[in-house]
């Protein structure tokens, strides 16, 4: 009897753990990492490294909640196509691990919680920016652009740029030009980052009838666009140097040259008809963004004198 009872409790524990992990997966934790990588340096730059740690923590909690809410809504809206794509077929709603209604409630709770938390702990502007981010990601990108245009990630990617705006506004209660410069960096970085991954999974997008650029254009055209946006990314990091010290400037130049080299190699390889590995660019683009923004954070904490 005791053994049977222990097994019953063990099964219930596993089911509970599986259910919790399914709800957590709805929020796409790995996507939220971008928030941490970009929001903290933005806040440090806004206060030249002397930002209140509690304010940073409160802003991150609100921002994470907003991102989690947006990702949850995205899973609900994309459940039909997630079932068709190998890369996303194991997502909770695609495999019916979570009822859609429960996912909607979770998304609403996270979004509302984010707004009120940021309003209470930082300022109204930050709360409104978080609310606008969720609305833009869900209604403009997910519902309007994603299934209608190959430029979906170009314009829809603006939602991923908002953490720096929220971080900056949490410190200053304004939107200054450095925040816009950081916004531009992430805006131009998003297409090459996303298209490199989409090149690897373009057949998935074709099956799901999602007009991601690699699924509807030639590899030559896609890699040319990747190269153009990589150049724009590297150049936009130099604009931010007007508000930073020599450390950020040096890292931005070196990292930009490295990122451009990888994009050029991908384009040249495709033009030459050689086998290419776009997934490598996707993975390294994450490292590039992390390096640039970490350099920004260190530069700000050290309060190095601005170059201009």
From Swiss-Prot:
Membrane-spanning parts: 20-40, 53-73, 102-122, 124-144, 149-169, 170-190, 227-249, 254-276, 288-308
CC terms in the record's Gene Ontology section: plasma membrane
S-S pairs: none
GO-annotated biological processes: heme O biosynthetic process
Membrane topology: Multi-pass membrane protein
Any one Gene Ontology molecular-function term assigned to this protein's record: protoheme IX farnesyltransferase activity
EC number: 2.5.1.141
Record has Transcription regulation as a keyword: no
Pfam families (alphabetical): UbiA
The keyword Oxidoreductase appears for this protein: no
Signal peptide (from-to): none
Gene3D superfamilies xref list: UbiA prenyltransferase
Main localization (coarse): membrane
Reactions listed under catalytic activity: heme b + (2E,6E)-farnesyl diphosphate + H2O = Fe(II)-heme o + diphosphate
Pathway annotation: Porphyrin-containing compound metabolism; heme O biosynthesis; heme O from protoheme: step 1/1
Subcellular location: Cell membrane
Keyword vocabulary terms for this entry: Cell membrane, Heme biosynthesis, Membrane, Transferase, Transmembrane, Transmembrane helix
Function recorded in the entry: Converts heme B (protoheme IX) to heme O by substitution of the vinyl group on carbon 2 of heme B porphyrin ring with a hydroxyethyl farnesyl side group.
Family the entry assigns: Belongs to the UbiA prenyltransferase family. Protoheme IX farnesyltransferase subfamily.
Extra information: Carbon 2 of the heme B porphyrin ring is defined according to the Fischer nomenclature.
The name this protein goes by in its record: Protoheme IX farnesyltransferase
Gene: ctaB
